[in-house]
Amino acid sequence: MATYRAKLPRGSHQPCHTVFIGHNPSLETWSSGHFFANPSNRFWSLLERAGIVHDANARLDDVLVQSHGYGFCDVIEQPGNNANDITPGQLKENTPLFLNRIENYAHGMNGTLKRLCFVGKRQWKHLFEPPLQRCDHGLQPQDKRPLAWPDLLREVEVWIMPSPSGRAVLSKAERLATYIDLADSFEHEVEEERT
């Protein structure tokens, strides 16, 4: 059995610019050690269709971590295939632990972290007290952060990605649109670095 843990670029790996943040690991992720491993989860196909990854090997999170500068973690590290089995109380109790973890990750990245992409709305909304009633997919306003948001992350973009779970009720076009917007932001960033 593989070991479940956050996957972040380290040492000789490509510097980390983006961390994808799930709600909690599926049972498949917990046992395999690979993120978004549930067969009904569309995460990898969404990245491919949006043009964020371009080769078949990039479907493996290990390859993305080592060669592409992506990281992966979950807000709450409790396995299960139904996010609703994790109560609002558990999410609230976990919030300071998660914020401390993500701040520590950012410290280790030495300023290379550009964006946090929450894969699904629920885990973002429950970082607020009281939890947000609603939020839109896409890039979040810079002034809309949880009260205990670490200062180190103040300039880091926050994106809310549509859930790739088979349980989420969205059309294919709705689900894909924000991933395309994210891919466009990567392209824009590369163009800015060239000029």
Regions found by a protein language model. Give the residues of each.
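Short, surface-exposed acidic-centric catalytic microdomains
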Residues: 28-92
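Short, hydrophobic/glycine-enriched beta-strand segments
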Residues: 17-23
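Internal catalytic-core helix/loop-beta-alpha segment
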Residues: 67-134
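Short glycine-/acidic-enriched loop or helix-start segments at secondary-structure transitions
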Residues: 29-32, 126-129, 170
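Short amphipathic alpha-helices and their capping/turn segments at secondary-structure boundaries
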Residues: 3-12, 56-66, 101-106
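C-terminal capping/extension of enzyme domains
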Residues: 1-15, 38-39, 83-97, 129-195
